[in-house]
């Protein structure tokens, strides 16, 4: 019998979408149905994934879908004995939303994406398929060049948009989590992310989503050398001292957690800007001891309302995503994280 039953173990559906498409050199998306089948097929010593997190956009989901269609999707997910956890709002330009530091029209698009996600979350909650999880957002401002032109003013624009988004979420009984990545302006370093979180100042509604791959590049100061906590050639002792410094700052805000691996590189595909490169769980070049690093983020997780953890491995080739061994290795890693740090 498994020694721990919480947090629940989820798989992300968006690796079937992110960086995929019909452009030159792109691979086609993998359908929600097939991603569910691949996830359901994974098994390690009789243990399975408990649920899924997913991105509320086409071709997986029309963010304007009718109640009837959304309930049909919930039934489809339930047919695999899965729960739904965290949902990704379509906040980016080219989906529904636009930059959180843009003009009034862009800001309204961003907020409309949050409203859509809250509506869908409420329908899933009412259906019974979703009993926990957050709605994931970020600044939706690709790159940091424009942000750098006036750091203080642009950070304030993001804070103001996030405050309005948090009020929308609160009215719907939902929580928002901003995912720190080096490619999103105002969220591209641990310090700038902390400035935004503290600027919003609504920890009960808007928190941080920590991803092991993306936060590794926070340590290295990839897009903010002035905030680097580590230099190349670091020792193991230096790594964990820096890791503790970063997690002590961001963990109190962390309400959603992505297990991931990174080899120290950045990667972009299709419409997705270069960001922390996700690697398979068993990648020999992985920089992270996944289980040990996860413990820094999952300390006191239950008290922050975390009820599940999710694997995130974006921009893998379809051949990797469609190989059963990929998901068994990931599930095995997730179980080891839960056995070490769960409850």
PLM regions and their residue ranges:
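Acidic-and-aromatic substrate-binding clefts and catalytic sites of carbohydrate-active enzymes
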Residues: 17, 26-31, 54-69, 93-100, ...
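A short, acidic, amphipathic alpha-helical segment used as a generic capping/interface helix at domain edges
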Residues: 37, 240-246, 284-304
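N-terminal pre-domain/capping segments
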Residues: 1-131, 153, 163, 170, ...
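Acidic/histidine-rich catalytic cores of soluble enzymes
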Residues: 153, 159-277
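Active-site groove signature of glycoside hydrolases
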Residues: 121-149, 172-183, 310-311
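A cross-domain feature marking catalytic cores of carbohydrate-active enzymes
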Residues: 9-13, 53-58, 86-91, 136-141, ...
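Aromatic-rich peripheral "rim/lid" segments of glycoside hydrolase catalytic domains that contact
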Residues: 273-275, 279-291, 297, 310-343
């Amino acid at each position: 019998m498994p020694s721990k039953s919480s947090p629940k173990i989820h798989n992300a559906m968006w690796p079937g979408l992110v960086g995929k498409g019909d452009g030159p050199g792109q691979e086609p998306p993998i359908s929600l149905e097939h991603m569910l089948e691949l996830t359901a097929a994974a098994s390690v010593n009789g243990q399975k994934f408990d649920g899924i997190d997913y991105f509320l956009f086409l071709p997986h989901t029309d963010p304007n879908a009718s109640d009837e269609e959304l309930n049909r999707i919930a039934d489809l997910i339930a047919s695999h004995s899965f729960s739904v956890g965290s949902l990704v709002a379509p906040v980016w330009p080219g989906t529904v939303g636009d930059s959180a530091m843009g003009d009034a029209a862009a800001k309204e698009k961003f907020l409309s994406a949050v409203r859509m996600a809250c509506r869908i979350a409420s329908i899933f909650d009412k259906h019974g398929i979703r009993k926990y999880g957050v709605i994931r957002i970020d600044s939706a401002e690709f790159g940091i060049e424009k942000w750098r032109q006036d750091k203080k003013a642009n950070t304030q624009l993001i804070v103001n948009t996030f405050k309005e988004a948090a009020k929308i979420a609160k009215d719907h009984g939902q929580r928002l989590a901003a995912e720190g990545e080096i490619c999103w302006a105002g969220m591209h370093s641990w310090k700038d992310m902390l400035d935004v979180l503290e600027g919003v100042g609504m920890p009960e509604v808007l928190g941080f989503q920590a991803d092991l791959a993306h936060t590794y590049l926070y340590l290295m100061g990839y897009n903010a050398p002035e905030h680097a906590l580590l230099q190349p050639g670091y020792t193991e002792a230096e790594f964990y001292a820096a890791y503790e410094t970063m997690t002590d700052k961001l963990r109190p805000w962390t309400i959603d957690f992505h297990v991931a691996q990174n080899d120290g590189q950045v990667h972009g595909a299709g419409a997705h800007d270069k960001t922390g490169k996700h690697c398979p769980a068993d990648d020999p070049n992985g920089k992270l001891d996944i289980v040990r690093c996860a413990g820094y983020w999952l300390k006191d997780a239950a008290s922050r309302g975390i009820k599940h953890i999710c694997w995130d491995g974006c921009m893998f080739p379809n051949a990797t995503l469609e190989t059963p061994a990929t998901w068994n290795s990931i599930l095995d890693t997730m179980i080891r994280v839960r056995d070490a740090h769960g409850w």
